[in-house]
Amino acid sequence: MRLGDLLAPFALLFALVAALAATPAHSALPAAYAPIVVQPTGLPDKAEFDLSAAQQRAQREGKRLYVYLGASDCPFCRRYEAFLDANAQELLPHFTPYLVVDLRSSLRIHGEMLYIRVGQRSLPYLAFQQSIGDARTRQVVYPSVWLFDSKIKPLMQMPAGTGTFQTVPEQLEILRLEQ
């Protein structure tokens, strides 16, 4: 058997992996919300999510940021995403002041690995939480949501994790910034 014959299956596998890596990122959030998908860079050592482009766009458009940290293998994230989809008709008008940002993660990404970048500044998750005055400065919780102004200043303290704002009235309170 020739070397080329032995390597052919590996070449096919490599081509398939390369094709999958080249496909555009898809949001887990419903398309109706027009989410900006941010994939992590720096894997496998760290997962850095760069909010710079979303922040710049928010500044240009005079919008706030609704930043969603979800994990592809998180059942509670799937539940929240399904809730948003099922209630889109009622919720979408209240999302108008926001750009929705979907940070695509996985449950294997923990706090020591997760970094948030804004401009030239990249901070580990806990340091980022502390820098914005977020009381949730512990381990990464999926799903998590932050509401920011266009300067990445938090607009309110947010709940996180299971059962988080899964009713329309709760979601509307958050979008309206009612504490």
Please provide the spans of the model-predicted regions.
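Bacterial N-terminal signal peptides that target proteins for export
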Residues: 1-11
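Thiol-/selenol-based redox modules, centered on thioredoxin-like
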Residues: 155-179
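A short beta-strand-turn-helix
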Residues: 46-65
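Conserved redox-active cysteine motifs that mediate thiol-disulfide chemistry
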Residues: 71-83
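Bacterial N-terminal signal peptides
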Residues: 9-19
